[in-house]
Amino acid sequence: MMIKNKKKLLFLCLLVILIATAYISFVTGTIKLSFNDLFTKFTTGSNEAVDSIIDLRLPRILIALMVGAMLAVSGALLQAALQNPLAEANIIGVSSGALIMRALCMLFIPQLYFYLPLLSFIGGLIPFLIIIVLHSKFRFNAVSMILVGVALFVLLNGVLEILTQNPLMKIPQGLTMKIWSDVYILAVSALLGLILTLLLSLKLNLLNLDDVQARSIGFNIDRYRWLTGLLAVFLASATVAIVGQLAFLGIIVPHVVRKLVGGNYRVLIPFSTVIGAWLLLVADLLGRVIQPPLEIPANAILMIVGGPMLIYLICQSQRNRI
């Protein structure tokens, strides 16, 4: 009981930190806001500075929160589905496949912009299925599976590089220049994906069982691995549709959360949601304040943090002979 209470208290503290960070992000930038500006806006309904920030900065903050949460949860789900602690959508090529589909859709069927998350999901599904088929045939260990994923990532990024030589297929990536329609599109996918994940989290711990144990209790482990993998691909692909590729969030956050609260997915999923949202928001905030008026992409900061962590996890997996 005491451990449960500690986890609840920690979760509430993280929520407070997340809200505080969102507020700091909202008032910080080339246009700075004071508390008086906000007070004037909410009492009189009129403040030009606040109005401009609501249109320019608030969509960016909301998208950062949703994308961070979705990528963190996607990473946790992929690791459960593939039984691989190194799995992450960007590393195994899912994000690249989704980005190629996004580019093709924007060129040939731009009128379907509001369906980009679903169309990107189709693109992200292809490399995931390739990984599954190859793994079922060759039974890769954790590191070998990641190497195959990296090969797919390189291949698909090469295809993407060729496609984007066409000026009509240039893809804006990152959190800049986001508008409210982007928020609405992503919010639908975020709500759907995260609600389904919370429902599925009741069964995720059983994915650690082997096939014999699962069958002995009547649990269809293959079906749930597929459902978990598909949901992970959907969450990651939906973020790609709006912000492009963001590296390593899906591998950093689940491992940090496991260190904090253990591997129970009923606890891991909510914590990953909050910490993932906070981490991307912090990366975006740092990118805006380190060298103003220039902006460092949040993805660059994530890569600086995530690269060493991936090396550490690979070394650890080799040591444990995963």
From Swiss-Prot:
<feature type="transmembrane region" description="Helical">
    <location>
        <begin position="267"/>
        <end position="287"/>
    </location>
</feature>
<keyword id="KW-1003">Cell membrane</keyword>
<dbReference type="GO" id="GO:0033214">
    <property type="term" value="P:siderophore-dependent iron import into cell"/>
</dbReference>
<keyword id="KW-1133">Transmembrane helix</keyword>
<feature type="transmembrane region" description="Helical">
    <location>
        <begin position="143"/>
        <end position="163"/>
    </location>
</feature>
<feature type="transmembrane region" description="Helical">
    <location>
        <begin position="233"/>
        <end position="253"/>
    </location>
</feature>
<feature type="transmembrane region" description="Helical">
    <location>
        <begin position="61"/>
        <end position="81"/>
    </location>
</feature>
<protein>
    <recommendedName>
        <fullName>Probable heme-iron transport system permease protein IsdF</fullName>
    </recommendedName>
</protein>
<keyword id="KW-0408">Iron</keyword>
<dbReference type="Pfam" id="PF01032">
    <property type="entry name" value="FecCD"/>
</dbReference>
<comment type="function">
    <text>Part of the binding-protein-dependent transport system for heme-iron. Responsible for the translocation of the substrate across the membrane.</text>
</comment>
<feature type="transmembrane region" description="Helical">
    <location>
        <begin position="179"/>
        <end position="199"/>
    </location>
</feature>
<dbReference type="GO" id="GO:0022857">
    <property type="term" value="F:transmembrane transporter activity"/>
</dbReference>
<comment type="similarity">
    <text>Belongs to the binding-protein-dependent transport system permease family. FecCD subfamily.</text>
</comment>
<feature type="transmembrane region" description="Helical">
    <location>
        <begin position="89"/>
        <end position="109"/>
    </location>
</feature>
<feature type="transmembrane region" description="Helical">
    <location>
        <begin position="294"/>
        <end position="314"/>
    </location>
</feature>
<dbReference type="GO" id="GO:0005886">
    <property type="term" value="C:plasma membrane"/>
</dbReference>
<feature type="transmembrane region" description="Helical">
    <location>
        <begin position="9"/>
        <end position="29"/>
    </location>
</feature>
<dbReference type="InterPro" id="IPR037294">
    <property type="entry name" value="ABC_BtuC-like"/>
</dbReference>
<keyword id="KW-0812">Transmembrane</keyword>
<dbReference type="InterPro" id="IPR000522">
    <property type="entry name" value="ABC_transptr_permease_BtuC"/>
</dbReference>
<keyword id="KW-0472">Membrane</keyword>
<keyword id="KW-0813">Transport</keyword>
<feature type="transmembrane region" description="Helical">
    <location>
        <begin position="114"/>
        <end position="134"/>
    </location>
</feature>
